[in-house]
Amino acid sequence: MNQDRKWNIVGGRVIKTGIAVFLTVLVCDFFNIPTIFAVITAIVTIEPTATDSIKKGLIRFPASTIGSAYAMTFTFFLGHQAISYALAAMFTIVACQKLRLHAGTLVATLTAVAMIPITANHYFTAFLIRLATTSTGIIVSTLVNFFIFPPHYTKMIFGCTEDLFAKTANIMEEWITALVAGKGVKKETAQDLSKLTLLLHKAIQFVQYEQKDWKYHQHTKKEMRSFLTMQKQLHILQQIIYHIDNLARVSIETCDWSQSEREILQRTIHSIIAILRNRCNEIDEEHFKLIAELDKQFWSYKNDLKDYKPNHYHHHFSSESIILFEVLSIHDMLEELKQISEKYEWENRFN
């Protein structure tokens, strides 16, 4: 297990960075041009997606050109003085910001200050060489990112979706435990909920990455259906997590359930947990009966509040009605997930 974990540290981007640096040095040596600036550019041009590599490469090239131009200009007039470094850095940053070349600001500034001490004469020639090395780094790293281990995030999205179903069920289980005990949600549950939200954001980011490179790779109809299904599932899981977060914020201590109400709620939550762990592939008839009972309870609490005439400000929803509303909302999301799953299975069977 530990060996697997150590090996996972060396991911695709790390390997691609090494390959890009290696090939960049070979190209620079072949054309007999300096390697250091090309290598720096190659390292920073490796992005999570091929699309980002191309877009940011097109930004970093003009940014580096600006940095090189300022470096050579100030070195020509002021020499290798401290003021040359400062002015080259300042003017490069300002120019990149004004021209909205934000992604290239850091590389351009590093290029500018690094060029000054190694250039003693032939400033225009040095400027042209710098353009060549920057171009080499961008082109090589973009090609490496595109053709070698091209980014495919579908498996990662699937893994995150599996984890989200399981961990969402676990948090629901922690919440029902707190409800039975009549105590507030534990600190650990709140932390688990935060981690769950981070996992969701990670999965959504992977979806965005996959969409960016969608046009560069061929996909079968089944792969496209699978991706779109997971995308829909993540959207609904996001809503479920939102409702669970609301549940975690309700004051459980103020709830006053009857024995039958508490029992129905517990059975419903346990049913929801089982459905989530089964990825919403099946919802039995017993679950719908429990939801019908819960729905009656919800409207009963609402009607009781409607007839209540307080002498001072009061909340329009009691803790009990909020909990019932959130649980019923989660059930609605589960039904949507089941429909998505059924549609995916049907399309795979007949297409």
From Swiss-Prot:
**Main location, first listed in the record:** membrane
Keywords on record: Cell membrane, Membrane, Transmembrane, Transmembrane helix
Q: Which InterPro entries match?
A: ArAE_1
Protein location:
Cell membrane
User: What is the topology of this protein in the membrane according to its UniProt annotation?
Assistant: Multi-pass membrane protein
One cellular component (GO) term of this entry: plasma membrane
Kindly list the residue ranges recorded as spanning the membrane: 19-39, 74-94, 109-129, 131-151
What the entry lists under Pfam families is as follows:
ArAE_1
Tell me its family.
Answer: Belongs to the UPF0421 family.
* Protein name as it appears in the record: UPF0421 protein BC_2748
Q: State the organism named in the record.
A: Bacillus cereus (strain ATCC 14579 / DSM 31 / CCUG 7414 / JCM 2152 / NBRC 15305 / NCIMB 9373 / NCTC 2599 / NRRL B-3711)
